Amino acid sequence: MKNIFKTMLTIGIIKKVILVLVLLSTSLNAQLDRSIMPESGPAPEIFFGKPQTFNLDNGLTVMVVENTKLPRASASLSFDNPLIFEGDIAGVSSILAEMVGNGTQSISKEDFIEEIDYMGASLNVTGSGAFAGSLKRYFPRVLELMASAVLEPLFTQEEFDRQKNLIKESLKTGEKDVGTAADRVESFITYGSQHPNGEFISQESLDKASLQDAIDFYNNYSSPSNAYLVIIGDVNYDEIKSKVTDLFGSWNSKEVSSSSFPSPNNPDETEIIFVDMPNGVQSVVSVINTVEFNKKNSDYFAALVANRILGGGGAGRLFNNLREDKGWTYGSYSGISESYKTKGLVIAQAQVRNEVTDSAAVELLMELDKMKNTYVLDEELNSAKAKYTGNFVLSLENPSTIAGFARNIITQDLPEDYYNSFLENINSVTKEDVQNAAKNYFLTDNTRVFITGKGSEILESIENIEYNGKKVKVRYFDKYANEIEKKLLLKFKSLRHI
């Protein structure tokens, strides 16, 4: 009887608890409208340890951030070189990037890789710098290997020829690829043939490049006077300073030469650049204009938010329009690239079916215009800010990100608290700020609409595209960015049907 009473008492208590939870849930649901996005909370406060900085006699700038949270350390070396125009030997830097880091003059490639693997470390060396990371106990040795790879790179004719041939094969593979042709022509036309960002690698330029060219390129542009070494992690400043001085102090400094090149310009009025790819089953449509855009711009953060709302991801307007609503593409995105050495780019892009190529081009222009002519919605603004906050916080887990922040503050002359206040600046952006930034950077009246695809199926409709009440001028190019006459294009078109 006692057991029955206890059981009944327990059941009664459980029923009361359930009743309370149901009533509480009902009350909460009555107060919470799930159709309304909750308001964003305050931006999390971010504090970066201020690096301790010193310079070696050869000009190498070293920044050390002590962080004993985990028994790990990393080193990031980068060169703040000017943009480099390679000219007749375009591609030599690409060959070089694959050669460095594969052993040194004192350590064979096999021994080099084996030792890195044994320590469970990472060491990546390219023509523009190096990154290394490991557990604390291995870090001194990893730093030694990094210094050896940078100061005593191993360049052999055999490895040079191997890497050159790999790039040649890659070029052959991309001969009929619509995306590859689009990228090449877009860069060339946007920046120009004499601009480092406009030149492209060809079989001919690779044939002209020699091993000595690669060695000269490395020696000319790998100088401590233009280099920054950022060390982060469980290290002691005095010990690291002594170690770095021993390893990098003998590195010979030299003046890094820079070349002049014309500044890219936008067209006087919007135009279409058409590139015929006879085998294309889809078209690449890109709306591109150049902009003066870097971290010191007063509307920098507003422009970032504007781009996020337009096409910075799967929640962007371009994606929702061309993918979710119309089903024309697997994805449509936008970007705004920054540079403190030349002009950056605004790009809105989609890869679509041939039959909707002209319509996609019009929709991209319309979405860009909409950003300029109307305010974004509150939920779009809040979502963009939340996405930036999440991405920014997650990025801080990567030591190379922190190293990049420290380097940027020096090379771009930014305030010391620039990244500490990054999220605050993002969250202070208003709808008015977004619209003004769109007006400043989304230059739909002076832009190029690049369309790369199968002319026999899309050219007629492209030539009838209208913008602002009049037909858009069309210019014709081959896949190597050579401008051609329409009649020549039509001749090739007729020959394909013979």
Short names for language-model regions:
Residues 35-54, 188-227, 259-264, 293-295, ...:
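Histidine-acidic residue clusters that define the catalytic metal-binding segment
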Residues 9, 32-35, 39, 113-217, ...:
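Acidic/histidine-enriched segments that form metal/cofactor-coordinating
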Residues 32-40, 228-294, 453-493:
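An aromatic/glycine/proline-enriched structural segment found at the starts
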Residues 166-185, 263-282, 323-329, 374, ...:
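Short acidic/His-enriched helical or mixed secondary-structure segments at domain edges of catalytic enzymes
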Residues 15-26:
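Bacterial N-terminal signal peptides
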Residues 286-288, 310-352:
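A structural supersecondary motif
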Residues 103-106, 134-164, 294, 337-395, ...:
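M16/insulysin-pitrilysin zinc metalloprotease superfamily fold
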Residues 75-136, 196-200, 312-328, 340:
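M16/MPP (pitrilysin/insulinase) zinc-metallopeptidase core fold and M16-derived inactive scaffolds
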